[in-house]
Design a protein with these regions (language model features):
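Glycine-rich phosphate/cofactor-binding loops in nucleotide/flavin-utilizing enzymes
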Residues: 2-23, 93, 114, 126, ...
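Glycine-rich beta->alpha junctions and the first turn(s) of the following alpha-helix
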Residues: 23-27, 212-310, 376, 385, ...
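C-terminal helix-coil-helix/basic helical segment that borders enzyme active sites and/or dimer interfaces
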Residues: 47-55, 279, 283-290, 306-339, ...
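Internal helix-loop-helix
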Residues: 69-139, 179-186, 323-326, 368-371
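A short, Trp-centered hydrophobic/proline-enriched beta-strand micro-motif
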Residues: 138-146
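Hydrophobic, small-residue-rich alpha-helical packing segments that form membrane-like cores
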Residues: 153-154, 169
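A structural signal for short hydrophobic beta-strand segments in well-ordered beta-sheet cores
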Residues: 160-163
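A short core secondary-structure module
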Residues: 172-213
């Protein structure tokens, strides 16, 4: 197996990344440079070590300073030490990290997209200045606490409470499946006040009554990123830690609309990795006296996989253009997330089939991408929830209740 694995790895490394419709030609020099440096990081720093961390369900802390050195945290945010890159460049960052590993991409996406994104969208200028520069340098890690044990898809019904007091708020409740929670320096907690209004509160590491230590490890996807259940028992939050412009659940929705686009890009990264692995494997694996790439059944699978990858790439590029023009709607983001997650899961499964039994081994990476895609399909709104958002948009009728 080692000889075959070495040949497949060499073939993947030597081949150009999948770009069948020559989308690379549409990138600016800046976008291409960002893509190239993140790809180099993913190939040289993430890919060689990630299987071991994934298998042990441990987070690769050694990568944090290397991610910081890339200078991409905060992606599209202007100022505050953030790069202010284009929406397309931000998508390429997510795609390239995910091509190597979904866990590392989730760590980055939660920190940069959900935590920093919420502060940027919902915070005052003073709050942005207070937190974003250190987060851009990854000196402080962020997390985003919305999902609860009893409320996943129905997150609008959240039960975590924020009770007013003279100098701030007291938070009580539980959050679950919170990425980065156990290692974060600050967690944005969405909670409901006495008037029923939903707001966002920045809880800092070490706050009395704040316990993010219940790490969820017995999972089969995204094993190298730590997700946890958070307990909040009479956690005191100063008034200045309530984000100034987070006043309703719609503000959480604004954040998720943006990050769903990121999940669509992530799906492309997983699909590209699996297609490229299957193509290389088919060229190296011989059965019945010739490479299996020469058989009609395998070529049919590869052609279908390439079609799915290319369609997902095109959808992401157009979505980024619409977002740059401030014309992207929540339903557009949902459609991209739904479609790309569906097709990426299909590509990963087809790649596993092309690799046969070897597709189940971590060594070939496909199995890791396949199980990680189950997580992508679930978080930031399941396939079914995205379909209801799109359905409501095209029919004018809500099927949520």
């Amino acid at each position: 197996m080692t000889d075959l694995l070495d040949r497949v790895d060499a073939a993947v490394a030597a081949a150009p990344a999948t770009d069948y419709y020559l989308l690379d030609e549409t990138l600016t020099d800046s976008e291409r440079a960002i893509r190239d440096k993140v790809r180099a990081f993913a190939d040289h720093d993430v890919l060689p070590i990630i299987n071991d961390f994934w298998e042990r369900a441990e987070f690769p802390f050694e990568l944090v300073p290397k991610i910081a050195a890339l200078g991409v945290a905060g992606t599209t945010i202007e100022g505050y030490g953030c790069p202010g890159m284009s929406r397309l460049a931000a998508g390429l960052v997510s795609r390239e990290i995910a091509r190597a590993d979904g866990s590392v991409n989730t760590f980055f996406g939660v920190h940069s997209g959900l935590a920093m994104g919420t502060i940027n969208l919902c915070g005052s200028d003073e709050q942005r200045e207070r937190w974003l520069p250190a987060m851009a340098r990854l000196e402080r890690i962020g997390a985003f606490g919305l999902t609860e044990p009893r409320h996943g898809s129905d997150s609008v019904a959240l039960e975590t409470s924020a009770r007013r007091r003279s100098d701030g708020f007291v938070l009580n409740g539980r959050k679950r499946w919170i990425g980065n929670a156990s290692i974060a320096d600050l967690v944005i907690i969405w909670a409901r006040d006495e008037d029923g209004d939903v707001g966002a509160y920045v809880v800092e590491k070490g706050a009395p009554g704040f316990d993010p230590s219940s790490v969820i490890t017995r999972k089969l996807g995204k094993r190298a990123v730590w997700q946890a259940e958070i307990a909040l028992e009479d956690v005191e939050v100063p008034a200045e830690n309530k984000l100034a412009n987070a006043r309703t659940f719609k503000d959480a929705g604004r954040v998720l609309t943006t990050t769903r686009g990121g999940a669509a890009w992530e799906s492309v990264g997983h699909a590209m990795a699996c297609y490229e692995a299957a193509l290389a494997y088919a060229g190296e694996r011989e059965q019945f006296g010739r490479p299996i790439a020469g058989f009609q059944l395998v070529q049919h699978k590869l052609a279908n996989m390439l079609a799915d990858v290319t369609a997902a790439q095109l959808m992401c590029v157009r979505l980024a253009q619409l977002q740059e023009e401030d014309r992207m709607t929540p339903a557009m983001a949902s459609l991209a997330k739904m479609h790309n997650a569906q097709r990426a899961k299909a590509v990963c499964a087809a790649a596993r089939d092309v690799l046969g039994g070897n597709g189940l081994l971590l060594d070939y990476h496909v199995a890791r991408h396949m199980t990680d895609m189950e997580v992508v399909d679930t978080y930031e709104g399941t396939d079914s929830i995205q379909a209801l958002i799109v359905g409501r948009d095209v029919t004018g009728l809500s099927a949520f209740a």
